[in-house]
Each structure stands twice: as C-alpha cells, then as structure tokens.
Amino acid sequence: MPLNFRDRFNVPVLKNGEEVAYLVGNSLGLMPHKTRDYVNQEMDAWSQLGVKGHFVSGKEDLGQDVHQGPWYSCDEPLHGLVGPILGASEDEVAIMNTLTSNIHSLFSAFYKPTAKRSKILFEAKAFPSDTYAMEAQARLHNLDPSEALIKLAPKDGLHTLSDDDIIKVIEEQGDEIAVVFFSGIQFYTGQLFDIPRITAAAKAKGCVVGWDLAHAAGNVPLKLHDWNVDFAVFCTYKYMNSGPGGIGGLFVHDKYADDQRPRLAGWWGNNAETRFKMLDEFDPIRGARGYKQSNPSVLCVLALRASLELFKEAGGIEKLRERSIELTNRLLKGLLASPHYIAPENIEIFGNSGKAWFTIITPQAEHQRGAQLSLLFGPDGTMKKVFDYLDDHGVLGDERNPDVIRLAPAPLYNNERDVDLAIKLINDSINLINGSA
C-alpha cells in the first residue's frame, strides 16, 4: 500500500517541471520539507539568542519559544526515534560524529588484540573507508595488516559472499579472531547478510561482533539488542534523509552499559549533570552515550529529527519495509522481463555477442536484500551510456565504476511510476545502443 509521504519531500524536477524518478536514496536521501523549517528556526534562534540558545528556549528573553529546545540537549529526542529503527533501547544508541570516525571510536574500545587472538574478519570488497579503518587499527596496535586482517572474498565467478562461507571461516579460525566486522548490507551488491546467524556463530567462538549498518539502518528492520550484537555504526544521510554529510550514530549493547572500558573519551560523553563543572575525572554517561566526544552540530541533529519524525508517522521501519519490498519486487520483476537481461550464470554463453546487456548481482530473495538492486552492464562502456540516458530522461540512479548502476526505491517517497519509468528507460537506452530502437 502506498504510504503517501512523497509530498512531504522536496523532489528534484526536470527543466519542464516534471519530477524526476529519484532512485538513489541509498546514496543520499531526499530532503523533507520539515528540514528547512527546523534548520531555519535554529538559524533564527542563533541570531536572536546567541550563546544563550545552548540553555534556553527563548521564552525568558523574547517572551516565546523560538526553537526546538536548548541546544545543550537537542540530540536527546533522537535516541527514542532511532532506537526502534535499530532494534535498540534509547540507552544503546548515540547520535554522534560520522561513520568512519565512529568505527575508530568503537574499535578503540572493543578491539583488544592479544598474542593468540588478534585478527579482524571482514569483507575483501568492503567500502574503502572501512578497509582503510581496519588497516589503520591493525597498525595502531603495531600489527601488520596483511597478517592481522582476514579479507573474505566471494568465490570465483560470484559477486556475493555466502553466509555459510563466512560462518565456516569463523568456525575454523575463530579462536584467532578478535573482531568480526561486516556490513549489514553490502554497498556495491546490495546483499543483506544474515546478521543474527553470523553474530551467533562469532559469539560462540568468543569473538567481538560489530556491524557497519550504513546501508541497512533505515532500510531493513534490525534487532541489534536481541541479536546480541556488541557494537554497530551507521550513517543517516541515506535512507534516513539527514542531508549531505549528515550526523552518524553508533550502537553499544546494553550489557556494556556500566562497564568503564577505556575509550576515546570526550566531554559530551561525561555525566550531563557535571559536564559544565569542568571536572578532571571522566564520569561516562551510562550506555552508548558515554562514547560521545563533542557536542553535536545542532543543524545536523535537527535535519535528522525532521526525517525520523516521518519514520514514526509512517508506522515505523516494519511498515516501511513492507512498502520497500513491494517497490523493489516490482523493479526486479520488470528488469527480469527485459529482453536485455542475462542471468548471471549465462553471461559466459550470451554475454559476448557484441550487444549491450545487463544482469542483476543483488540476491533476488527478499530476505537477502534491502531496497537496492545492483545492475551490472556489458560490454565495457555500456553502463555509462545507460546511466547518462537515465539521467537525461529523468531517472536518477547511482553509478559505480566500472560497470554497475545501483537503483534503490525508497518507500517514503518513491512510487510505482518511478520504478516503471526506470525499467522503460533502461530498455530504451539499450535498444538505442544496439541500434534496435
């Protein structure tokens, strides 16, 4: 069932005024109308209150509330909004920093290599920033990344990792693995990993388990607490529509809520009651918020709040997932029916005809993907031609060189027209390339 929230967002338009089919919420979500209102309100508060905005609403000086609340606590309402999206309590989440910095923050607290258990297991084709972070963490502990990192790659001829293969490595090498750290949804292929199963296997071998949920948070329902995940990081500018470079977040399981483990501490993780007393001794807030470091950007926080309120109004992540499945299934069905589609197992047979073609490298089963489908085009040079044609005719997707276009219907603002237009234009563009238009 349509959720009818499209008119709550700013949808880009073509020169003729027609709305584009924006299928790239997996890269940057659209801006809710409310975001501009919230941000402008805080700009007004800054201009009228100055530094007092940290502690007052404006009523004391101006006779009326002029913003969403004191900046000192502006992020507090977000924990209750994002918790249900992650399957976490308010105390298990913190809105802070950005994704890679949060990876480093949590690895500093949870990656404790020993002589017997020092390795990190993750994807060979992880998002580059994750790879850089893993290599940096190894070096920070005076370890050789080539020895400390187990980079697990798909089998020859495949684009995705098997959950079974991941678990096999955990069972065989788990006694040497300190941290298992995968992406919930793989950024390139769109594969959704079996988070609870992989987590359980790793925990059974004594490993710490973390997840990069950049492409999973706000996309698929998660149950991080129930799955016994140790920690996780996420960004909010994709499916949670917080804006370019939007604030990130992290999850730390409640079983660590009262532990005083060393961390990259900062004053915003200190007990709020004594924070401004400027005491020398660090007294961490209970739970994930004890990992905060600096006061967050008010404008980024309010941009995220505007979108999270729409998540709640729409009925939550489970309701959005139902709509997401409808839209992505429609996209998948239309693409599979294309005369230019070649099944992955048939590419060697039919992919060398000289004609343009595409396949889908995202798993087709609903439980193995989120909103995104990744289309691989051939021969070389086809993807760019198709991408430019889509862009010129009102479909925005995401190109990943050398040969992939990612399309991701977002349930809050995409509709059947967007999906059907993408299917039509992909077929039209390949017809033109092949000279059969």
From Swiss-Prot:
E.C. number: 3.7.1.3
Keyword set, alphabetical order: Cytoplasm, Hydrolase, Pyridine nucleotide biosynthesis, Pyridoxal phosphate
Main location: cytoplasm
Molecular function GO terms recorded: kynureninase activity; pyridoxal phosphate binding
Domain of life per record: Eukaryota
Family: Belongs to the kynureninase family.
Its job: Catalyzes the cleavage of L-kynurenine (L-Kyn) and L-3-hydroxykynurenine (L-3OHKyn) into anthranilic acid (AA) and 3-hydroxyanthranilic acid (3-OHAA), respectively.
Protein name: Kynureninase
